[in-house]
C-alpha cells in the first residue's frame, strides 16, 4: 500500500471512530460507483450525512479544509445523489460534513469535524 493510501485509510479509520463515539451510525464506508467514491455515509439522528475525510501529516499542501471546495464539493453532491437513488428509503434530511484528521509527526492525532461544510 502506498504511503498516501495508508495515510488516507488511517484518517478514515480515525474519522469513523470519532463519528461512532458521538453517536452516529456508519451506514456505508468507501461506497463506490463509476463516478467516484464517498468516504463515509452516516446516520446522525434524523440527518443522513455524507462525510468527506481529509487527512494531512503536515501543512505542506495546505489545510485539509482547502481541499474540499468547488468541483470537489460538486462531485460529492453528485455521488450523494447516486447513493440516494440506490437507497430510496434513506432519510430526506441530508447534510455534507468534512472531517479533517491531522497526524503530525509528533503529538496527538487531531480531528476537526465541520458540520454542514458545503
From Swiss-Prot:
SUPFAM superfamilies tied to this protein: Restriction endonuclease-like
Pfam family, one: UPF0102
Single GO term (MF): nucleic acid binding
Highest taxon of source: Bacteria
Family: Belongs to the UPF0102 family.
HAMAP family tied to this protein: UPF0102
Protein name, per record: UPF0102 protein Francci3_3586
Source organism of the structure: Frankia casuarinae (strain DSM 45818 / CECT 9043 / HFP020203 / CcI3)
